[in-house]
Amino acid sequence: DRDEDEFVMALSKFAEASEPTEAELGAGVEDHRKFYMGQTTNKKCACYTARAAVIYTDPEFIDEEPDASYTGNVAPFYPKNVTWKFKRPQDGNAPASAGTKLISLPKLKESERDALDENHVNYLTDEYKRQYVKEGVCLNGEFIDIVIGGDWIAKRMRDLLYDILLNNANINYGDDGFGLVATAVLQALAE
């Protein structure tokens, strides 16, 4: 596990490049989209990429693995009924009372929080007597749940369409054929 900026940026760019284009999908390229979740101690971290999210922590807390803690708390609800905004990382390596282990709150000035927000870097905050990750965004500013939800819908829709195509010897170009194909689309969107 490497947390240096060059690794964070390289892995972010790798994840972004993993999304196939429509032309590639049409040519039969398999869809193996990646999503990268990383952590940084650089308050000026800036890497405008899609399909990657980074969480900031102070250097002395880097071993608490806030990226894994954040992912571990939210990912089990994937893909349905989840938003990555306003979530608390759990089961970190920070010492806590009563057996609860959370990650440590970074010590940030308002200007540093503003810089992290501007660069779309997530961080643990304490507002209204609650600790949570405020934004839940990718490095390009898109919400994490939008990206992952879109991936899930695309995969589910593709699976349902293949089921229809493989289980029906003939799908005509009339209303009933289009209706049959539309059921896969509507079912994926309804799930």
Each PLM stretch: what is its role?
Residues 136-191:
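Structured, hydrophobic secondary-structure cores that serve as assembly/anchoring elements
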Residues 32-34, 44, 98-107, 112-121, ...:
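Glycine-centered secondary-structure boundary/capping sites
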Residues 84, 100-101, 130-131, 169-171:
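Flexible, active-site-adjacent loop/turn segments at secondary-structure boundaries
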Residues 1-99, 137, 142-143:
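Extracellular Cys-Trp
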Residues 104-146:
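Assembly/oligomerization interface modules of large self-assembling protein complexes
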